[in-house]
């Protein structure tokens, strides 16, 4: 069982245990968001939307160098055309349709799973993707949300005198989309075997003599020690031609990279997207 499977099983067990209690929705309120699965007709005014709950956002690593590149691809979608065109019940015909997924709502604590494990159908083996993949300490997700995309589409329609069939939601404050990195789960090894350890930002201690820089800790089995966040690149981003070189010029930490990221919203919000006072 890898870390993602453990996380899924843990949340399933917690949800089952809390059913019919006062805290039944605590995981959803804290960690849960919603994705919007959209079908957008091209050449017809109709569109459909199906909501999908999530506790973790899965992002591709392969072929991307940065988390924002992967997020751009996440919401890009695909065109259904020709034989694959979508049948519009209202138009009573097949039409070219954009099928895409975007973020409808965000949780206070966002889990991002980096897809570092995949199945190679040529070799019929599970492999680990050790490619370099950068992620920031501060993350803004506004342009990957349904509200933002609808607003952009409405602006385009306004420019050409068109009319949208979708209602644009009330604007959320910018702080709704801003996150700080709070934790990183590192995997060291290959697709068949390995070891996990965690980097966690100390919420209470800013670090003596370190100004406003928060203290980070490394939790590795029973070993707990301070971690210098300036070393995050070498510890967690993965392998590249120029990354992870030791003093002799040889690569080190091959196979050691981030697998799961935990981001905390800078300003907490409730289910109604209202700020929660500190």
Segment roles from a protein language model:
Residues 1-53, 89-92:
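Papain-like cysteine protease catalytic cores
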Residues 19-22, 26, 46-278:
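Exposed substrate/partner-binding surface patches
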């Amino acid at each position: 069982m890898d870390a993602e499977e453990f996380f899924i099983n843990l949340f399933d067990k917690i949800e089952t245990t809390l059913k019919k209690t006062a805290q039944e929705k605590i995981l959803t309120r804290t960690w849960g968001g919603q994705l919007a699965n959209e079908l957008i007709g091209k050449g017809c005014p109709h569109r459909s939307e199906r909501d999908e709950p999530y506790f973790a956002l899965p992002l591709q690593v392969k072929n991307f160098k940065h988390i924002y590149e992967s997020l751009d691809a996440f919401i890009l979608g695909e065109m259904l055309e020709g034989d694959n065109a979508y049948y519009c019940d209202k138009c009573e015909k097949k039409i070219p349709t954009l099928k895409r997924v975007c973020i409808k709502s965000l949780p206070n604590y966002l889990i991002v799973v980096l897809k570092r494990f995949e199945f190679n159908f040529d070799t019929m083996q599970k492999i680990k993707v050790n490619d370099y993949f950068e992620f920031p300490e501060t993350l803004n997700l506004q342009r990957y949300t349904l509200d933002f995309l609808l607003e952009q589409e409405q602006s385009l329609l306004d420019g050409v005198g068109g009319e949208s069939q979708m209602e644009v939601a009330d604007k959320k404050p910018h702080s709704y989309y801003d996150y700080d990195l709070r934790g990183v789960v590192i995997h060291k090894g290959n697709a068949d075997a390995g070891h996990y350890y965690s980097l966690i930002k100390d919420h209470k201690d800013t670090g003596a003599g370190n100004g406003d820089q928060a203290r980070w800790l490394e939790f590795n089995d029973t070993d707990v020690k301070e971690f210098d966040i300036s070393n995050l690149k070498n510890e967690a981003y993965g392998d590249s031609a120029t990354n992870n070189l030791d003093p002799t010029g040889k690569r080190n930490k091959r196979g050691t990279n981030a697998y799961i990221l935990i981001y905390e919203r800078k300003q907490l919000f409730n289910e109604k997207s209202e700020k929660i006072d500190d």
